[in-house]
């Protein structure tokens, strides 16, 4: 819906995995769709039933299939494609190495991860996030410092990485968004930082900005929703992605 409202033609793909044949057919279909797409979006919302231990692992397993990996590599390196992952999709992009490295690769001990919320349970609320960098095509319609009220709903959203890695992400402009308090200041305090993400990081990008992952559900907002919540709620992510190809 969010992409269609932004002017895109969106195809929803459902992975079928009840049999080995169904998996093989799903892989073949996914490869075909990637080769005929300009944008690949990995959704959240308890994708795959949030199993096993967070559905990002299931999504990542599919994308590590050699045929799909090859299609994604060609999609990013030769066709200037864009990728977006929200919530579970963000988890998958991180587990694949697409974030923050921009390619599907084996992870190292210092690679960033998304782990369990500090409070040890699921959180569902509205939080404020601030645009830190708009080097990504996904954020071309906003400016650094802009603040948006966005929904969160997750159990494993805490961004964690060694401090040296995080500093490098900031230096490269790859930290896209942070959780902030009512004064617009990044914070580690609940409920403003709902999961305890280090440096209040909510979303990051690949080095070239074309792969973007975030925990907050920007796709949930429609006009007339959250009427009792103040603040700007439209991050213009989807229209930015679509406009990139115009």
Predicted regions and their residues:
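C-terminal and late-domain segments of enzyme folds
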Residues: 4, 126, 131-246
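N-terminal beta1-alpha1 cap of cysteine-dependent amidohydrolase-like domains
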Residues: 1-86, 90-101, 109, 115-124, ...
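Short clusters of hydrophobic/aromatic residues that line enzyme substrate/ligand-binding pockets
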Residues: 59, 114, 138, 142
